[in-house]
Amino acid sequence: MWMGKKGATDEQIDEALEISQSKEFVDSKQGRLDYVIEQGGKNLSGGQRQRLTIARAIVRKPDVLILDDSASALDFATDAALRKAIRGMNNSPTVFIVSQRAASLMYADLIIVLDDGKVAGMGTHDELLANCEVYKEIYESQFKKADSEGGVA
């Protein structure tokens, strides 16, 4: 965690772990923050690695936070909790999210939909559902998949 911000306080680290949905699994590790992570994070799951990376970014309190497919290894419920926590941050940063998961973008001020490298649509979630067939197809296919898996889209 100190790779994100040297000299970060325990409170700052705990806040970043809470927001990134990492606190529970970090608290379960022997030694907690002194737990040794192997080269490449081999002793962590993909979702744990992603959440710790997000925590390291959050602990810096950036003005701009870029999340590039940051939830690909997270289940739908954890992804939703992460998005909600980021929206609720004090002095919330400007967040750019690159995602193939439509649910990760639902509350964005502006969504840009790309199809074969070209802009297929721009707008809010509701605007795109009404006016962009590419976005609507992606959203509906992912929403049906989440329902069948018992998750939240």
How does the language model describe each region?
Residues 99-101:
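Conserved H-loop
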Residues 45-46, 52-57, 81, 97:
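ABC ATPase nucleotide-binding domain "signature" region
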Residues 59-63, 92:
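A short, proline-enriched helix->beta-strand linker immediately N-terminal to the Walker B motif
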Residues 28, 32, 84, 88, ...:
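C-terminal portion of ABC ATPase nucleotide-binding domains
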Residues 23-52, 67-70, 74-77, 144-153:
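ABC-fold ATPase nucleotide-binding domain signature/coupling loops
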